[in-house]
Curated annotation (Swiss-Prot):
Subcellular location: Cytoplasm
Biased composition (Basic and acidic residues): 49-63, 121-177, 210-261
G5: annotated segments: 617-619
Annotated region (G1), positions in chain: 481-488
PROSITE patterns given in the database record: G_TR_2, IF2
Keywords, ordered alphabetically: Cytoplasm, GTP-binding, Initiation factor, Nucleotide-binding, Protein biosynthesis
Occurrences of domain tr-type G (ranges): 472-641
InterPro entries in alphabetical order: DNA-bd_dom_put_sf, EF-G-like_DII, IF2_assoc_dom_bac, IF2_II, IF2_N, P-loop_NTPase, Small_GTP-bd, T_Tr_GTP-bd_dom
GO annotations of cellular component type: cytosol
UniProt protein name: Translation initiation factor IF-2
Family: Belongs to the TRAFAC class translation factor GTPase superfamily. Classic translation factor GTPase family. IF-2 subfamily.
Gene Ontology molecular functions: GTP binding; GTPase activity; translation initiation factor activity
Protein species of origin: Burkholderia ambifaria (strain MC40-6)
Biased composition range(s): Pro residues: 277-286
Gene expressing this chain: infB
Length: 972
């Protein structure tokens, strides 16, 4: 958009128009206002002026910055054959400054040298990446060779096992053959012995020779069998040892292969810059790789042969370059860590079976079940071996997590100690000081009871140091009186706005703050409700006020809330100006009003008192000027002063939760100046003032003493009547607010009336007490507390009002869920439920009642409580009967012949037996007959027969008093 005037050009430059006018005048361009036209020549003059003022002689550009980015890719494949791409990105930034012609040649030479250096750097880095890829390829080739070697060893092992098995079978066959041969020899010997016995005489010498030879053969056979068994046993032991050795080697090789695969799959760190080009190192031979094959705890297997790569900034390496002998320098089995391996791989390490590495290079979990934890790092830091005894300052209350943090241990350790002490706790559970100190001592530290750090003391110190000039301020006037006496209408005439028409039912239910400018000065008015329910609001109004205007209707006189307003004013020591309203009515009687006020201790000036009485009419405007004159006169007498150039202090008049704006508070500034952007503290709420509106809804940047404003930006809805303080920083405000929240947490929990064991026992002792649970949501804080107090006053010994929850804002789903759990009725005072809450309430059958007049809410709750009362039982005497004769009837009992002397007797009635006018029995009629016929009722003057249930001691002359019990509904 073209800028044709000063205002548009300032908006385009995003600067205040006043500053732009000053710069134009300094440049010699005469512009008087924001609407003056602005030409291109004027803009050029302004630009030249600004350049000269900032030291620029001409508009030529003498510096230019060039940025260049070069990206290259390197492809490689890992051990699994999966292709991976490594991207190398080089960024260059060059700034050229125009100098004299003499230095241009040298500058060009330096630029060419720098570009040549960059090209050499790029080539060197590409060479490093290529060498890394070659190294990875060599490792993959080495892995394949190891796998082939393992396969060959496995085949050799199987062949040896088969040969051993064949040898064992052959030995068994030989042993069996030898045993068979021995048996045959023994049979031959037996036969020969028999033959020898037959030919003993002729062949004695021959048989002796044969016997000696057989014994020698048997000895030889036993020796051979023993040797064969020993050989078979040795072969089996050797085979088992070889199998165990092969199994161990296979497991070690598999663990190493798994570690190499993890190493290959781990993302590498990008190469940034090396200190000097690495020297090519030959990879280790497979035969010499004993450390990696037999000690599987080594993570990489070729870490000593890898070139060092510089880590990113902030991670200082142990050495800038790892030569071939770097692994021997640390004297650790298995060599050192690879320089290119990232921190995650270092932390993981390699998990192996057993502890074959001697527990040296095992990472964090080297041994079984985490034994021998330590980290093999190249840094020189050594963890302390002795326990550190700390001095722990324990506050009055501390959570388990905070206590563990103070001792620099995990919260689980504190929970373990508490469990050993027999107490089950969670990480967020709060411990008292005594328990926390016992836990600290149990863990071997020194516990010191910390002093209570009360941040409230900072506020007192801040007040003591504040010293500002006291300047006059406008008076704060509170309009008080009985309901419907015309307070708001009177203020409405003063403000010339229709406020009373906007209140539901024509009665004020909110406290309003307005300031009015008169010819003699500014007056701030606080309009308070007159209904009896709003006692707390009137008390807050009297607390913040300087002068009270007591409005009394001339036709109504002094009423209960008028007396209460007088009591509030006297308690606060505030002067009273009496406005006798409605003098335009024919039935007005100002003299009677004066007499009634004198009886209450408010004496008019004409009677020698100190309270001016002004007759006014809010309808016609009569006496309004005199009323303002008297108010300002009282203010002059009081000499009201307050510091202006100081941090603001005030009081929360009203607070509410707006759906679009969040927490909104109406604040009356009592001293200092409140600016937009200040950090305020109101009770347990804090925040920065995001927006500030006056009573008419217009934005304002600041508010001085006695000025009411509406602020936004608080963390929560503050309580009405809370003191508002401006603090220098938000951190201190948050600290004090959290301290106050923790300090009053017990009070807040007590208000929720949780079902504790003690309260349950009390209710059991009280008997059956009906409860009416309610959830109250109001538009502002004052209305909410007024409604709560009014409903709580309705409680009786039989029916009790239970406020489950009360808050400011609309009715939400959480409120409906709470009502479902507590079986409560939701009351919305000038608020509504959103769509989700209404739908949930309909599905759960929750009753939501909306009110905008406090009368209606109180009356309906009162009616509901009346319906919960037990009905009252009343006795109504319906007749009197005289016994004339008594009959004894078998199987029935005594039957009295009676005469109805008064009223009527019904069969369903109850009866009292009177003898000599003394009640001797109370019961029910069992039968009612007339001439042997059962009848429902007998009227006066007729005879009848009657029998009383469970009573036979009837004599002549007794009287029966017949009555009925009726239930009557009770009301509160």
């Amino acid at each position: 958009m073209a800028s044709n005037n000063v205002a548009q050009f300032a908006a385009e430059l995003k600067m205040p128009a006043g500053v732009l006018l000053e710069q134009l005048q300094a440049a010699g361009v005469q512009k008087a206002s924001e609407d003056d036209a602005l030409s291109e020549a004027d803009k050029a003059r302004l630009l030249d002026h600004l350049r000269k003022s900032h030291g620029a002689t001409d508009g030529d550009k003498r510096k230019i910055t060039l940025t260049r980015k070069h990206t290259s890719e390197i492809k490689q494949s890992d051990a699994t054959g999966k292709a991976r791409t490594i991207q190398v990105e080089v960024r260059k930034k060059r700034t050229f400054v125009k100098r004299d012609d003499v230095a241009e040649g040298a500058e060009q030479g330096q630029a060419q040298v720098a570009e040549a250096d960059d090209d050499a750097e790029l080539k060197r880095r590409e060479e490093e990446a290529r060498r890394e890829a070659e190294l990875l390829e060599k490792q993959a080739q080495e892995l394949r060779e190891r796998q082939e070697r393992l396969e060959r060893e496995e085949a050799e092992r199987r062949a040896r096992e088969e040969a051993a098995e064949a040898e064992r079978r052959r030995a068994e066959e030989e042993a069996a053959a030898k045993r068979a041969a021995a048996a045959a020899v023994e049979a031959q010997q037996a036969a020969a012995q028999q033959a020898a016995e037959a030919q003993q005489e002729t062949a004695g010498a021959q048989s002796a020779q044969d016997e000696a030879r057989a014994a020698a053969e048997r000895a030889a056979q036993r020796e051979a069998a023993k040797k064969a068994e020993d050989a078979a046993r040795e072969a089996a032991d050797k085979t088992r040892a070889e199998q165990e050795e092969i199994r161990k080697r296979r497991e070690a090789a598999e663990a190493e292969a798994r570690a190499i695969r993890e190493m290959m799959n781990t993302p590498r760190k990008a190469v940034v810059k090396a200190v000097e080009p690495p020297k090519p190192v030959e990879p280790p031979k497979p035969v010499e790789a004993k450390g990696t094959l037999h000690k599987p705890a080594k993570p990489a297997g070729a870490g000593a042969a890898r070139p060092a790569v510089k880590k990113p900034a902030g991670a200082a390496p142990a050495t800038t370059q790892a030569p071939a002998g770097a692994g021997d320098r640390n004297k650790k089995p298995g060599g050192g860590k690879g320089g290119w391996q990232d921190d995650a791989a270092k932390r993981r390490g390699i998990k192996t079976r057993g502890d074959s590495s001697g527990g040296v290079d095992r990472g964090w979990r080297g041994g079984p079940k985490g034994r021998g934890r330590h980290q093999d790092s190249a840094s020189t830091f050594q963890a302390p071996t002795e326990p550190i005894v700390r001095e722990v300052h324990v506050p009055e209350t501390v959570s388990v997590a905070d206590l563990a943090h103070k001792m620099s241990i995990k919260a689980s350790e504190v929970i373990k100690v508490m469990m050993k002490m027999g107490q089950m706790v969670t990480i967020n559970q709060v411990l008292d000081q005594e328990t926390a100190m016992i836990v600290v001592e149990e863990l071997g530290h020194r516990a010191v009871a910390a002093k209570l750090d009360d941040p409230e003391a900072l506020l007192v110190e801040g007040e003591a140091t504040t010293d500002a000039e006291q300047l006059p301020r406008p008076p704060v006037v509170t309009v008080m009186g009985h309901v419907d006496h015309g307070k708001t209408s009177l203020l409405d005439h003063i403000r010339r706005a229709k406020v009373a028409a906007g209140e539901a039912g024509g009665i004020t239910q909110h406290i309003g703050a307005y300031h009015v400018e008169t010819p003699r000065g500014v007056i701030t008015f606080l309009d308070t409700p007159g209904h009896e329910a709003f006692t707390a609001m009137r008390a807050r109004g009297a607390k913040a006020t300087d002068i009270v205007v007591l409005v009394v209707a001339a036709d109504d006189g002094v009423m209960p809330q008028t007396k209460e307003a007088i009591a509030h004013a006297k308690a606060g020591g505030v002067p009273i100006v009496v406005a006798i309203n409605k003098i335009d009515k024919p039935e007005a009687n100002p003299d009677r009003v004066k007499q009634e006020l004198v009886a209450e201790g408010v004496v008019p000036e004409e009677y020698g008192g100190d309270s001016p009485f002004v007759p006014v009419s809010a309808k016609t405007g009569v006496g309004i000027d005199d009323l303002l004159e008297n108010v300002l006169l009282q203010a002059e007498v009081l000499e009201l002063k307050a510091p202006i150039e100081a941090p603001a202090k005030g009081i929360v008049i009203e607070a509410k939760l707006d759906k679009g704006k969040g927490p909104v508070a109406t604040i009356l500034v009592q001293s200092g100046t409140l600016n937009r952007g200040d950090v305020v503290l109101a009770g347990s709420a804090y925040g920065r003032v995001r927006a500030m509106l006056d009573e008419n809804g217009k934005p304002t940047k600041e508010a001085g003493p006695s000025i009411p404003v509406e602020i936004q930006g608080l963390s929560e809805v503050p309580g009405a009547g809370e003191e508002v303080i401006v603090l220098p920083d938000e951190r201190k405000a948050r600290e004090i607010a959290l301290f106050r929240q923790g300090k009053f947490r017990d009070v807040k929990l007590a208000k929720q009336q949780a079902a504790k064991l003690e309260s349950m026992l009390e209710q059991m002792g009280e008997g059956e007490v009906q409860n009416l649970p309610l959830i109250i949501k109001a538009d502002v804080q004052g209305s909410q507390e007024a409604l709560v107090q009014s409903l709580l006053k309705l409680s009786t010994d039989e029916v009790r009002v239970q406020i489950v929850h009360s808050a400011v804002g609309g009715i939400s789903e959480n409120d409906v869920n709470l009502a479902t759990a507590s079986k409560a009725v939701i009351i919305g005072f000038n608020t509504r439920a959103d769509a989700q809450a209404r739908k949930l309430a309909e599905s759960n059958g929750i009753d939501i009642r909306y009110y905008n007049i406090i009368y209606d809410a109180v009356d309906e709750v009162k009616a509901a409580m009346s319906g919960m009362l037990a009905p009252e039982k009343r006795e109504v005497i319906t007749g009197m009967v005289e016994v004339r004769q008594v009959f004894k009837v078998p199987k029935i009992g005594t039957v009295a012949g009676c005469m109805v002397t008064d009223g009527i007797v019904k069969r369903s009635s109850s009866v009292r037996v009177l003898r000599n006018n003394v009640v001797i029995f109370t019961g029910e009629l069992e039968s009612l007959k007339r001439f042997k016929d059962d009848v429902k009722e007998v009227k006066q003057g007729f005879e009848c027969g009657m029998s009383v249930k469970n009573f036979n001691d009837v004599i002549e002359g007794d009287q029966f008093e017949v009555f009925e019990v009726t239930e009557v509904a009770r009301t509160l």
